[in-house]
């Protein structure tokens, strides 16, 4: 079969047009198939044949023609297309062989062998085509749905609690007070535990100042954070009293507070020999109660 590949582009270029290269004279547009099964479905629909009664001679011929067109335009043919071509040729040859009669076969294993031999060779191909068509239809249906983040966008709102219908409430016919009374009876049967409350001694401002002085004298400096270590587990009241003691010592110019950089560690340094002259009775706690 010969084709006339001449087109209007073979004519001489008109005035003002650039000459065309030989590769631009002949162009073929082929549909893009996902695989050999997709191509077979296309051929079956194009020639309007029954998928359950595939004319292998016609379909094989059209399939090979399509592969030949792909070669003509220098397309790389995937191996799966060539495997399907050989499969179609094999099925076509099997269809030409005479079928054996199951009734004339012997009983036992020979019957099963003959039954398999007399089965329609196209059955497996039809099954694969139907299964592929099912997944293809599902993919096309999913492709029509809106895509989150592209077509639709979710609102970032807190999920509200779903109200429970009244008929699903478990305590509908039971008093909650009775449940509380039952809990009280269980607690009464438990062995009572001895409870005692530990009360910390109240720290005065003078005592807090002396504690800071004791931390400063050995090393000549102390970190502010080290006055509140987790090992000593200071109470909220002790933390406040210690902070007031530091303010009082700065006010009386007993210590200096130094920070070399923003958000850096805070150092407490003695102001000369002022700490050596400090007497415990010089601070009155009445101003900070």
From Swiss-Prot:
The keyword Cell cycle applies. Disruption phenotype: Conditionally essential, the primary defect in a double scpA-scpB in-frame deletion mutant is in chromosome segregation and organization. Cells are temperature-sensitive; they grow slower than wild-type at 25 and very poorly at 32 degrees Celsius. Increased sensitivity to DNA gyrase inhibitor novobiocin, cells are longer, and contain 2 fully replicated chromosomes that are not completely segregated. ParA, PadC and bactofilin BacP are less organized than in wild-type. All these phenotypes are stronger at 32 degrees Celsius. Pfam families: SMC_ScpA. It is found in: Cytoplasm. Keywords: Cell cycle, Cell division, Chromosome partition, Cytoplasm. One of its GO terms (cellular component) is cytoplasm. Induction: The 3' end of scpA overlaps with the 5' end of scpB, indicating the genes are cotranscribed. GO terms for biological process: cell division; chromosome segregation; DNA replication. Gene3D superfamilies: 6.10.250.2410, Structural maintenance of chromosome 1. Chain E. Residues 1-24 are annotated as: Disordered. It comes from the Bacteria. Disulfide bonds: none annotated. Residues 1-18 have a biased composition (Basic and acidic residues). Its main location: cytoplasm. The keyword Cell cycle applies. A conditionally essential component of the chromosome segregation machinery. Participates in chromosomal partition during cell division. Important for positioning of ParB-parS complexes (ori of replication) and of the ter replication site, as well as for segration of the ParB-parS complex and thus chromosome segregation. May act via the formation of a condensin-like complex containing Smc, ScpA and ScpB that pulls DNA away from mid-cell into both cell halves. HAMAP family: ScpA. Belongs to the ScpA family. Component of the Structural Maintenance of Chromosome (SMC) condensin-like complex composed of ScpA, ScpB and the Smc homodimer. ScpA and ScpB bind to the head domain of Smc. The presence of the three proteins is required for the association of the complex with DNA. This is Segregation and condensation protein A. The gene is scpA.
């Amino acid at each position: 079969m010969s084709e006339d590949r001449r087109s209007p582009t073979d004519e001489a270029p008109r005035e003002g047009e650039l000459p065309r290269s030989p590769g631009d004279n002949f162009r073929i547009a082929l549909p893009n198939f996902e695989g050999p099964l997709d191509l077979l479905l296309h051929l079956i629909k194009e020639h309007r044949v029954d998928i359950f009664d595939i004319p292998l001679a016609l379909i094989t011929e059209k399939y090979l023609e399509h592969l030949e067109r792909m070669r003509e335009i220098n397309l790389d043919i995937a191996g799966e297309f060539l495997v399907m071509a050989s499969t179609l040729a094999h099925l076509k040859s099997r269809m030409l062989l005479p079928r054996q009669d199951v009734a004339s076969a012997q009983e036992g294993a020979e019957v099963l062998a003959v039954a398999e031999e007399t089965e329609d060779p196209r059955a497996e191909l039809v099954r694969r085509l139907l299964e592929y068509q099912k997944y293809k239809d599902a993919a096309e249906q999913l492709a029509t749905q809106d895509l989150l983040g592209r077509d639709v966008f979710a609102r970032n709102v807190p999920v509200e609690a779903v109200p429970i219908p009244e008929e699903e409430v478990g305590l509908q016919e039971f008093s909650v007070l009775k449940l509380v009374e039952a809990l009280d009876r269980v607690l009464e049967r438990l062995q009572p535990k001895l409870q005692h409350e530990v009360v910390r001694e109240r720290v005065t401002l003078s005592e807090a100042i002396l504690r800071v002085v004791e931390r400063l004298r050995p090393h000549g400096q102390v970190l502010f954070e080290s006055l509140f270590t987790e090992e000593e587990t200071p109470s909220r009241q002790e933390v406040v009293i210690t902070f007031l003691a530091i303010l009082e010592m700065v006010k009386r110019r007993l210590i200096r507070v130094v920070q070399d950089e923003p958000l850096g560690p805070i150092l407490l340094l003695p102001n000369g020999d002022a700490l050596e002259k400090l007497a415990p009775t010089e601070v009155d706690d009445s101003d900070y109660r």
